[in-house]
Amino acid sequence: MNRRQFLSYSALAAGTATAAWWQLRRSNHPPSVSVRRIGLPLAHALRDAQLPLTHSREQSCDTLILGSGAAALSAAWWLVRNGQRNILLAEGFERNGNQAAYTFGESKSSLHAPTGAHYLPQPSAESIHVRQMLHDLGIIQGSKPLTQPIYSDMDLVHQPDERVWADGSWHSGLLPRQDADTKRFFQYIATLRHAKDSSGNKAFAMPVALSSAAEEWRRLDRITFAQWLKQQGYQSPVLWWYLDYCCRDDYGQGVAQVSAFAGLHYFAARGNENAAVLTWADGLNHIAEKLRQFIGLQGLADFPDTAEYALRQPASVPAVALSVEEQGDAVN
């Protein structure tokens, strides 16, 4: 190939690539973005007293579950597992609530993305109900799901070791630097993970009901996390920022409002701290949909036209509770 031919072919290749790139841009417009403020109009109507709270008819059922998030579907799973089926579930503002997901497209190659919770840490040894649920849903495998759970590699994702970008470089863990206070705090947390009371109960366990009831630990519930940190002499701004962030993320309040027990429980109660987490393309919507299948939840367009429900199969309706009033062992 002489020089003229080489330059001709190079120009042709460059022109073809440029044309293809422009064609790709023309045919693949970025999707438009819209914000769905779930429940906002109804919340404003309630705030402004624009909705009547008096009921127009009375209906009853064995069990009414409000919402369709993790707590609601877990409750339905437990009831069905124990033989109850006369259950009505009010879906709430969004299907699957805090486990909701978004699907773009209707084919097998559709894009799925979580709009709610997106991962689940591997359940601790004390979280036997969660392990049992995951076993029922086929997520935990093996003959000893409660004591020796086996997970599919397709369901596990390892967290990156380096995920904080600060001062021009990546840092291991979740903090840009490990100062003396930070090291001391996490060394203390490492001991708390194995701390037990005189009865052999873990000081901090998940679920929290299995945590020690001993006064030496429960007295931490009477002071704030911020007060405890000051008592222990922690002054690092980086550590304080991180602990406040964690509390706001999990509890909705910072270290000045969250109790010391709750703050320490966040770090000390989780088993498998550095293990891979369970996640899917649509986040925990994957578990929510599996729960619906396990329960056999059938969707209804409206409430059944009867005064007393005798559902043979759990059902759901697109409804929201505006007012809940306790009345003995029942609610209105």
Task: Map each language-model feature to its residues.
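Extreme N-terminal leader/targeting segments of oxidoreductases
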Residues: 1-62, 81
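N-terminal Rossmann-like FAD-binding beta1-loop-alpha1 element of flavoenzymes
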Residues: 62-89
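Glycine-rich FAD pyrophosphate-binding loop
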Residues: 80-105
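Mobile amphipathic helical/loop "lid" adjacent to a hydrophobic cofactor/ligand pocket
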Residues: 135, 143-257, 273
